Amino acid sequence: IINIRHFTRYLNATGKRAYIPSSEYNVKTRRYQPYIFNDYELSRLFDEIDSLKNRRGSEASNPHLILPVLFRLELCCGMRPGEPLNLRVEDVNLRNGDIFIRKSKRGKDRHIIMSEEMRQLCTAYDGIAGEREWFFPYTDGGKIPVRWVMWNFNKAWNKTGLPIRFNKPRPYDLRHSFATQTLMRWVDEGRDVMTLMPYLSTYMGHVSMEETLYYVHLLPERIKSSPGINWDMMGDIYSAEEDFYEED
């Protein structure tokens, strides 16, 4: 419906009369509500992540070295949970902070730049990890399985003892928090959010701007009213998308 709506608008703009389907034609499906961490929750969560230790008999090695870096990449660089696991050593340039993400969602490659603080953390980890193929290696030298990452994230969250405000947090929600924190920082700095949105979209590897604009609607009400967010420019993108948003 969204593609048809955009196409019929284009036809009308070129002088050809065409019916533009209204929102009543939208397919209604349940949308997952991302868990956006507050500062205290993130502080408690990473306290527990930083203190995780290996289980007796576990096949994974050095969780106390790997997990603090891996989860911070997701939070500080907006990476999808599987992307850090697919990094080879040569994909992480520790001199300039460039990370090459290969064949991620929909087979797309992209480059992202780490902050200086994140680069220093990765450099310190690299010096300890030694010779290897994968930036975050499994005990057999291969890639770490997603199930191990999920298990440790859940373990860390449960150890915080924090109440769950709605849906239980997942590693993917670190990526969502990165997006909303970036938008809130731009608003606080008085920047034009709509002008900067394409940069965030490219950085996160989104296929379309609609996927990135979704995050505007997760912001607190006081921020959504900022002059840096031009709702007229957004049109009805979100109203058309909101009932069938695909997590990206």
Where are these regions (language model features)?
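Conserved catalytic core of the tyrosine transesterase superfamily
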Residues: 1-248
